[in-house]
A protein has these predicted regions:
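GNAT-family acyltransferases
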Residues: 1-92, 96-100, 113-121, 126, ...
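Glycine-rich acyl-CoA binding loop
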Residues: 105-108
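Conserved beta-strand-loop-alpha-helix junction that forms the acyl-donor binding cleft
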Residues: 129-139
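Conserved active-site tyrosine of GNAT-family acetyltransferases
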Residues: 142
Length: 172
């Protein structure tokens, strides 16, 4: 296993020291989008929502995970991938922790679990992430996870972003 000390229970439930990452169904994901504020919902990619509606069975690359705090059982966020690995072996991660639980290392712990799952899959050479083009909590999470800043990019969905990459050990 990688640095995150991830234990994979039933496929794919991921346990870390403080968190349980539970695979979500498309219905759960779509319900969580509906529960968002209109401003947050406007940031969700229509293409991604269409993929979610068309999916027939949950899978880790498409549906993502509910982040559950193991000690309390509370759902404290979500995390996942922006799709399956591409032909080049690149996958993008995304994560969000509810404000009441931020600042406690849970985003870093969830990100490390996603990284370990991706790199251990044998399908991924590089894990990437995009952030707003400024130093913020997400850039600190990625730095702690060993990502390297690759520069600015224009993302078709998000506009100007900073791109971060973490190659597998074989790629370094």
């Amino acid at each position: 296993m990688r640095e995150a000390s991830v234990a994979l229970m039933r496929e794919p439930e991921i346990l870390t020291a403080n968190l349980e990452l539970l695979l979500q169904s498309s219905e759960e994901v779509l319900a969580s989008i509906e529960a968002m504020s209109p401003a947050d919902r406007a940031e969700v990619s229509p293409e991604w929502v269409a993929r979610m509606k068309a999916s027939t069975a949950p899978d880790a690359w498409t549906h993502g995970f509910a982040v559950v705090h193991r000690a309390s059982g509370a759902r404290i966020g979500s995390c996942g991938y922006k799709g399956p690995p591409g032909p080049e072996g690149i996958v993008e991660i995304a994560y969000g922790i509810d404000p009441a639980y931020q600042g406690r290392g849970y985003a870093t712990e969830a990100a490390r679990a996603l990284i370990a799952f991706a790199l251990d899959s044998g399908q991924v050479r590089v894990v990437c992430a995009h952030t707003r083009p400024e130093k913020n909590a997400s850039t600190r999470v990625l730095t702690k996870c060993g990502f390297e800043w690759m520069g600015e990019r224009v993302d078709p969905e998000d506009g100007l972003v900073w791109r971060w990459e973490l190659p597998s050990n074989e790629e370094k």
